[in-house]
Swiss-Prot record:
The keyword Membrane belongs to this UniProt entry's keyword annotation: no
Protein name per the record: Protein nucleotidyltransferase YdiU
Matching PANTHER family: PROTEIN ADENYLYLTRANSFERASE SELO, MITOCHONDRIAL
Catalytic activity: L-seryl-[protein] + ATP = 3-O-(5'-adenylyl)-L-seryl-[protein] + diphosphate; L-threonyl-[protein] + ATP = 3-O-(5'-adenylyl)-L-threonyl-[protein] + diphosphate; L-tyrosyl-[protein] + ATP = O-(5'-adenylyl)-L-tyrosyl-[protein] + diphosphate; L-histidyl-[protein] + UTP = N(tele)-(5'-uridylyl)-L-histidyl-[protein] + diphosphate
Catalytic residue list: D252
Organism phylogeny: Bacteria, Pseudomonadati, Pseudomonadota, Gammaproteobacteria, Pseudomonadales
Ligase keyword on record: no
Binding site for ATP: G90, G92, R93, K113, D125, G126, R176, R183, D262
UniProt KW keywords: ATP-binding, Magnesium, Manganese, Metal-binding, Nucleotide-binding, Nucleotidyltransferase, Transferase
Length: 486
């Protein structure tokens, strides 16, 4: 493992030139102090976890110091926000500090969020508050532990720097890791500003660095777009299967890598509600849980439009047509596994849909239902789960069909509990748990943030003394809508 001064840098995106980003130095925050760090994220950089305890760690990730090899850049892009095109967005408070090359040959972006004003700040102060920084840290690491593709969070650094949102809060910086920070909106920017040469440079960069397997295809650009469609189909299937609501699926928040990116007012479902809206600014429900599948397809079509400079329209349409069937296949596979099924039958999707309809009628905690279902033999588990349902007749009918379906599985029930527990988390990042940790951190106590992070790092394993993190939320903690304010 390495010390901070032993990291290797290779700033590929910065070398593309000033048409793609602007060099900006971070603005330091006062009295930097470590709030929380992720050892598993540090390992991606080959970084010794003990480095997080050194004063220089907080200084480097709060803008006070820079590596000599760093080339901090604010990236320019545009995007569709709530369906309307915004011609110039860009990194308004974040900087791509550098790209680290690890010993495995992987490049990882170091992105500092809350680093101060940039040419793209759009009247903002360029800061991030402690509250939103902790939320992104927890979500990144929780999703990773669930097996959902996501950007990673290296650390959160707190400060005494005041910032004003609805009230006075303290500034913080979050260091995000991803193998690229290129968004759908990057391609939209060069398309709508009619810069075809820069557009092609960017496409070639993404193809070369992130989709090298597509270079030998007969149509490399089309092969790359098809792979992006495939990755997003799997990503959204995992969101839906695990009840994750992103909240702000604007095209500038969509990663070209097909990973969860740019967290805002996200939430995991508590009681199942297909129409749940986690963002209180989303008054029309554009980004509700139920709409995430069609919105992902819409966003991919926006990307396809931006790529018409290098790919013919009809092949793009054909590639877009892959999204829904791929999504459905991934989603059904995940839901079969969550139900403990190891084989496929034609009516399995109907079985899943009937279960969700029963849940929708009220009273059922989405995550805990699946965990309970695997605790005991099927008949006994159904009796226990029944108590949570309002639609008892509907659940009884479903339960009878599910019991019969399980009876057609090959072999016996040996290993069913282990199989189901391996895919059904006991611990989920619920907004009320995050809020309690944030309130403690705002009072200067970071222990709850760190404890919650450690629990969520092993979501499928029962952890002694951590039962409180596996309980149903209190009524006040359910279906919290979160502000975009950050």
């Amino acid at each position: 493992m390495k010390a901070l001064d032993q990291l290797t840098f290779d700033n590929r995106f910065a070398r593309l030139g000033d048409a793609f980003s602007t060099q900006v130095l971070p603005e330091p925050i006062a009295d930097p102090r470590l709030v929380v760090a992720s050892e598993s994220a540090m390992a991606l950089l080959d970084l010794d976890p003990a480095q997080a305890e050194l004063p220089v760690f907080a200084e480097l990730f709060s803008g006070h110091k820079l590596w000599e090899e760093a080339d901090p850049r604010a990236m320019v892009y545009s995007g569709h926000q709530f369906g309307s095109y915004n011609p110039r967005l860009g990194d308004g408070r974040g900087l791509l500090l550098a790209e680290v090359l690890n010993d495995a040959g992987e490049h990882w972006d170091l992105h500092l969020k809350g680093a101060g004003q940039t040419p793209y700040s759009r009247m903002g102060d360029g800061r991030a508050v402690l509250r939103s920084s902790i939320r992104e840290f927890l979500a990144s690491e929780a999703l990773h532990a669930l097996g959902i593709a996501t950007s990673r969070a290296l650390c959160v650094i707190g400060s005494s720097t005041p910032v004003w949102r609805e009230t006075r809060e303290s500034a913080a910086m979050l260091t995000r890791l991803a193998q690229s920070h290129v968004r759908f909106g990057h391609f939209e920017y060069f398309y709508y500003t009619k810069q075809p040469e820069q557009q092609r440079v960017l496409i070639d960069h993404v193809l070369e660095q992130h989709y090298p397997e597509c270079r030998e295809a007969e149509q490399p650009y089309l092969a790359m777009f098809r792979t992006i469609v495939e990755r997003n189909a799997e990503l959204i299937a995992r969101w839906q299967a695990y009840g994750f609501c992103h909240g702000v699926m604007n095209t500038d928040n969509m990663s070209i890598l097909g990973i969860t990116f740019d967290f805002g007012p996200y939430a995991f479902l508590d009681d199942f509600d297909a129409n749940f809206i986690c963002n209180h600014s989303d008054d029309r429900g554009r980004y509700s849980y139920a709409n995430q599948v069609p919105i992902a397809h819409w966003n991919l079509s926006a990307l396809a439009q931006a790529l018409t400079t290098v790919i013919e329209v009809e092949p793009l349409k054909e590639a877009l047509g892959l999204f829904l069937p791929l999504y459905q296949a991934h989603y059904l596979d995940l839901m079969r596994r969550r139900l403990g099924l190891t084989t496929a039958e034609d009516d399995d999707m109907v079985l899943v849909e009937r279960l969700l309809q029963c849940m929708q009628r009220g009273g059922v905690d989405y995550s805990l239902f699946f965990r309970k279902l695997g605790e005991q033999p099927v008949a006994e588990a159904l009796k226990v789960a029944r108590d949570d349902f309002i639609d008892l007749a509907g659940f009884d009918a479903w339960g009878a069909d599910y019991l019969a379906r399980c009876g057609r599985e090959p072999g016996n029930a040996e290993g069913r509990r282990e199989r189901m527990h391996a895919v059904n988390p006991l611990y989920v990042l619920r907004n009320y748990l995050a809020q309690k940790a944030i309130e403690a951190a705002e009072a200067g106590d970071y222990s709850e943030v760190r404890r919650l992070h450690q629990v969520l790092a092993r979501p499928f394993e029962e952890q002694p003394g951590m039962q409180a993190y596996a309980e149903r939320p209190p009524e006040w903690g359910k279906h919290l809508e979160i502000s975009c304010s950050s």
